[in-house]
Amino acid sequence: MIIRNFPKQTNSLLPFELNPNKFPSYYGYPMYGYTGSYRNIEFPISQNGNFLQATSGNPPGRRVPEPIYSSGVQRSTRINYLPSSQSCAPFQSHADCDKSPNSKGGESYDWNYGWSSCCSGFCPSKRECAKPDPKECDIGNDILDRDPLLKIEWDVNAPNYRCTYDLHKINTSEQINLFVGKNGKNKSYDEIMTSFCEIPSHICPIDPGDGSLNDDKRGKEMEKCSRLISLDDEGTRCRAWAATQDNKTIDNIKEEYCLHNPNSPDCRCINRSSNSLYDEAKKNNPFPDGCWYKPCSTSVYLKTSDILSDEKHCPKEMCQVIYNVNQNNDVVIKDNTNNIKCDFTKFIPPTPGPNPGPTPGPNPGPIIPPINPLPLPNPTFLENKNVLITGIAVTGVAVLLFLLLMFKSKTT
């Protein structure tokens, strides 16, 4: 659905897209019905298409902004006049310019920028006066076509002026550029950037997931994120500015953003105390969250400076200690492992299986009775046998010799 009844502006401000019930807050104010989207910023819109203006004041918990000032020396005489108390007539005294509010809470004479001749120079001249001109303060309207200027007044005395702006109506890069062109990068510029960088963006990096098994957003672009990590020009601007600020300032921006955007994926580390699994794992855990809690060790998510510092001092034995403390706590060891930056499987002993009984050996086949070897002859018997054989041999040789002798004697 596209809103088409929005007051006509430059073409770059249209169209606005309606997103029903998508985001819970606008700069910390409750939102109702629909939101209008322009340049990936959400604004409250009623269901009939009219923009809802933020109420005055700040709801509970919302940081009260410092006034935003711009000052300079007026050159415009656009809102000019001649004092009505002086007429062009002889012997008239010079009437003063009227008075306008000043920055001290009082009034100062308007700027007497020249003189107007009376009676062709024969009567006393009249002062030419100019009031503070709001055009001197013009930095353009905001995303909802609202003028952020609250008032212009003389800065003590004319022609010095001071402008006061509504911080929540300065929310475009174009406004900031015009402000810097008039004032440079002063304290008010830092206040503007603080508020500007707390606005959500929808041009976001890939969500690495928080480690949950049912995290269906993992690997997809975040639907919403802080401008401190967004991928648009506003994100680039915020990161460049943040690099010039102290840790406390940037920590406050991150915490303020996550306070009013609790469902923003990049707040999973900062809003970790709202996760019951984190609370369970934190019990008896002496280690810094930046070491063991996965959302706080993921580079894409918002992290405060203490978490960033913790990541540099993580003990090597951390996972073993966490396991030892929680080894009987299934909520930590089994249900919460996806949030803890540890592989507990290396510490969990293997579960013993059922007793398998004796392992059967190979089939031995048919049983063959053993063959008993013949008994070795008695050594004494062998010795006697050898003597007998020797005796028989000697006797045989003697018989042969006798027979030979007998045969020889007969032949002779």
Curated annotation (Swiss-Prot):
Transmembrane spans: 387-407
Alphabetical keyword list: Glycoprotein, Membrane, Transmembrane, Transmembrane helix, Virion
Keyword Transmembrane helix: yes
GO cellular component: membrane; virion membrane
Record: glycosylation sites: 171, 186, 247, 271
Location (main, coarse): virion
Keyword Cell membrane: no
Topology within the bilayer: Single-pass membrane protein
Subcellular localization: Virion membrane
Family affiliation: Belongs to the IIV-6 337L family.
Name under which the protein is recorded: Putative membrane protein 337L
